[in-house]
């Protein structure tokens, strides 16, 4: 049963590039860029780029990203990282993924935000050309900070410039970062700007802040919600999620580590599914959380008694929630049915 449910892990819609670099890749590219690392082996390095068992909250969790980001400041490194991630996803048997990153975090040296987007797109195309994935796409993250509105607006302009509907490429924007420190309500200007330009978006909300953050994201017009766990605390928000069919990108391992939920028994996934919320299952950060999409399903099978019907619903929800055209969603379903006929 457990192995069977792990097989449902073939789509990941909430996957951060900088939180999913392999230690082996980091060692290779640290040498190429003359960056000193705190450890010389992949096993030893993992301790520095993954969350500790006693992680206190999301803010501590986010500190694990400093080292990986330091290695992603050249076009060559950024392209290679995207390609490497896609190849690892392919080895894990995935068929579709949406990889997200914040262009503004890759400008510490000489790259512009547009340079970063172009580099990631090159890596995306190279990765897809060398794998059997149905497709992969990119989501550009705006960041929660006190004084970076101009950088966020630039990210949105780039998303509009490179937005694609049918070819693999940029499909949406996101708002990521320390939700508890920088409330969602302060970013209305960014999402008004995105709406005016027809750029779809997901927003991290209801992770380190309460249901009011999810409400704000819905009011802004979010197509999806990243995490959204604390929506369960408000019947008003729950009803909107159900009525609007707004998908939630849920990431159990990460949510446990950031103390969004104290224990898996408290996880609201089953309630969401039973009430008709379009919940999906994702990894968040493969390296920081030491997980993969199959591990997320395995965890829920072993400790949450996830059923086959629930696993199947999560997979169907992921197809429906993907930033894909309706034609591509039908093609993705057909691809899964042909490649993994036992799943659907």
Swiss-Prot record:
Enzymatic class: hydrolase
Keyword Metal-binding in annotation: yes
Catalytic reactions of this protein: adenosine + H2O + H(+) = inosine + NH4(+); 2'-deoxyadenosine + H2O + H(+) = 2'-deoxyinosine + NH4(+)
Binding site for substrate: 16, 18, 177
Domain of life the protein comes from: Bacteria
Site residues, Important for catalytic activity: 227
EC number(s) given by UniProt: 3.5.4.4
GO CC field: cytosol
Alphabetized Pfam families for the sequence: A_deaminase
Keyword tags: Hydrolase, Metal-binding, Nucleotide metabolism, Zinc
Keyword presence, Zinc: yes
Molecular functions per Gene Ontology: 2'-deoxyadenosine deaminase activity; adenosine deaminase activity; zinc ion binding
Residues annotated to bind Zn(2+): 14, 16, 204, 284
Signal sequence range: none
Active site residues according to the UniProt entry: 207 (proton donor)
One GO-annotated biological process of the protein: nucleotide metabolic process
Role description: Catalyzes the hydrolytic deamination of adenosine and 2-deoxyadenosine.
HAMAP family: A_deaminase
Family: Belongs to the metallo-dependent hydrolases superfamily. Adenosine and AMP deaminases family. Adenosine deaminase subfamily.
PANTHER family the UniProt entry points to: ADENOSINE DEAMINASE
Stated name of the protein: Adenosine deaminase
Species of provenance: Haemophilus ducreyi (strain 35000HP / ATCC 700724)
